[in-house]
């Protein structure tokens, strides 16, 4: 697969202003923001492709999304998220998804979510007229918590200044649904996409869910060319801004001296660069980890460099579920069959068992939005199954794979009879596969759970106990998902850029900018709401 960015083909410079470890969307956006302000940036990725979960792979002429295929807001230029991509020079094309999602229920009925909010509300009220008043009240609360949540989690407004958020702050999705509704099927319908959070509704924040729920209606998109096209273009823009990218290169440790991050020790794993440079220490003013937080603190930093007891609160945090994926290349299956079959398949109304037996799987056909992902006239189907599992309790991953695949293909035949005879290419990815290619703890989908107690101050901050060491992405604030990790990148970029200005004023040349007579523009965290929040000038 030819990539548009070049990547370093020579040894890296001995020193950079910033080293970013990991090229998920958080790392890619952050590197772009820093490079845009003139910082010399090195982005390091252990895989041979960039993107993390937002990447693709090819098998037999089919291009499969490794994981992510759901991109709220990014294709809408009227949202601040979409506008940010434009400011960074990203020209990726986006296909709007309508319906947004489809839910298949145990009684055989289905509900397709329209892309327009008014149409969605009208459809809900038509199917549940006895709950019409409750729906109005519920979505009034959703809208309010959405805006207040943006101020709190994305803009950093303290909870004490947002009195109207207090009644909702500790509320879970399940508690909210039980408060407003009686019909168990309507409750499931309103939480039927909860697998995208990687946790059951009883452990998912109502506020954070509200923020995503309403963002659907500002546009939910699939990238032209697939996820890799988006990630690769972000990498290309980094290089155009003067940044460097090292793929197939593992960060072995973060160099800590006198309590400060001073660089990273790197090892080239494969590729032609290894003949000229096997690895070594690259010095930097700041280091940012876009990787797994436990791996960062336990292995790259080391407990000896952390304050006593610093690791225990992190080890107690709950990670999101892993997601099993089966990627299928199909021949001779009409697009209309897949269009009808797409969506979440629920076998029980008990949504708390989402990672066990309540949710059969989700089906998604990317070729309905981007036909070029498959050979002409052929199709791709991705089967996703969220799994609540004991990762370390699996002693035979091959047997685990056989059992899950047997379940998936037996049930897939129930949905689309005869489909197994049309499979040309078949590939499956377990939690262990996700860990292998991304190094995410136990193959977690979205970092830590987005439960009320693991958001805000309950979630690790981007600044660490080590000076000049930051974290970005779904293992830190504000949370998991495409928009939150972009906000994370903006927040970290702002901290780094403001820190460099302060260092230049104090005469600390290790962090100071080369040009000290002007402050770079620290990016405002983006929001993508029904209402755009006014930008406030930072003093």
Residue ranges of model-derived segments:
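A glycine-rich dinucleotide-binding beta-alpha-beta segment and adjacent secondary-structure elements
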Residues: 183-197, 358-362, 418-478
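Short beta-strand to alpha-helix junction loop
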Residues: 78, 162-175, 215-237, 246-248, ...
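Extreme N-terminal leader/targeting segments of oxidoreductases
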Residues: 1-18, 36-37, 451-455, 463, ...
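Rossmann-like flavin
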Residues: 106-204
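Helical element adjacent to the flavin cofactor pocket in flavoenzyme catalytic cores
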Residues: 210-277
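C-terminal segments that line or cap access tunnels to active or ligand-binding sites in enzymes
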Residues: 331-433
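Mid-domain catalytic core of redox enzymes
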Residues: 252-375, 513
């Amino acid at each position: 697969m030819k990539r548009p960015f070049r990547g370093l083909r020579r040894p890296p410079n001995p020193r950079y202003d910033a080293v970013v470890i990991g090229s998920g969307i958080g790392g890619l956006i952050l590197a772009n923001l820093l490079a845009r302000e003139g910082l010399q940036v090195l982005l390091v990725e252990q895989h041979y492709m960039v993107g993390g979960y937002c990447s693709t792979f090819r098998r037999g002429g089919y291009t499969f999304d490794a994981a992510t295929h759901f991109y709220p807001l990014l294709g809408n230029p009227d949202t601040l998220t979409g506008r940010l991509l434009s400011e960074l020079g990203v020209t990726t094309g986006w296909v709007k998804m309508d319906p947004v999602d489809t839910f298949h229920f145990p009684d055989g009925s289905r509900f397709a979510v329209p892309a327009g909010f008014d149409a969605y509300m009208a459809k809900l009220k038509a199917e549940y007229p006895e709950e019409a008043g409750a729906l109005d009240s519920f979505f009034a609360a959703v809208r309010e918590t959405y805006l207040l949540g943006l101020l709190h989690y994305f803009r950093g407004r303290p909870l004490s200044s947002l009195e109207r958020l207090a009644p909702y702050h500790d509320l879970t999705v399940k508690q909210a649904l039980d408060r407003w509704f009686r019909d168990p099927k309507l409750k499931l319908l309103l939480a039927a996409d909860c697998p995208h959070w990687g946790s059951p509704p009883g452990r998912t924040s109502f506020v954070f869910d509200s923020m995503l729920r309403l963002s659907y209606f500002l546009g939910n998109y699939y990238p032209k060319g697939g996820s890799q096209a988006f990630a690769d273009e972000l990498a290309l823009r980094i290089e155009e801004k003067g940044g460097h990218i090292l793929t197939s290169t593992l960060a072995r440790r973060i160099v800590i001296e006198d309590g400060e991050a001073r660089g990273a020790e790197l090892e080239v794993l494969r590729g032609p660069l290894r003949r000229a440079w096997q690895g070594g220490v690259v010095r930097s003013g700041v280091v940012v980890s876009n990787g797994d937080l436990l791996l960062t603190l336990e292995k790259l930093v080391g407990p000896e460099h952390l304050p006593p007891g610093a690791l225990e609160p992190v080890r107690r945090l709950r990670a999101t579920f892993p997601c099993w994926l089966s990627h299928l290349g199909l021949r001779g299956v009409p697009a209309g069959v897949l269009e009808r079959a797409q969506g979440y398949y629920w076998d029980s109304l008990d949504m708390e068992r989402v990672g066990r037996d309540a949710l059969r799987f989700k089906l998604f056909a990317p070729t309905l939005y981007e036909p070029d992902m498959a050979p002409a006239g052929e199709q791709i189907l991705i089967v996703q199954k969220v799994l609540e599992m004991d990762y370390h309790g699996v002693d035979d991953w091959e047997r685990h794979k056989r059992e899950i695949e047997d379940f998936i293909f037996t049930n897939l035949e129930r949905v689309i009879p005869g489909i197994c005879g049309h499979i040309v290419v078949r590939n499956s990815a377990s939690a262990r596969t996700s860990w292998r290619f991304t190094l995410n703890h136990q193959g977690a989908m979205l970092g830590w759970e987005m439960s009320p107690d693991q958001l805000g101050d309950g979630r690790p901050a981007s600044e660490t106990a080590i000076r000049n060491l930051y974290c970005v992405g779904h293992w830190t604030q504000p949370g998991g998902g495409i928009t939150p990790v972009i906000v994370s990148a903006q927040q970290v970029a702002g901290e780094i850029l403001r820190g460099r200005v302060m260092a230049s004023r104090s005469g600390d040349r290790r962090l100071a900018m080369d040009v000290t007579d002007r402050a770079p523009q620290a990016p405002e965290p983006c929001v993508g709401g029904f209402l755009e929040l006014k930008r406030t000038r930072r003093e």
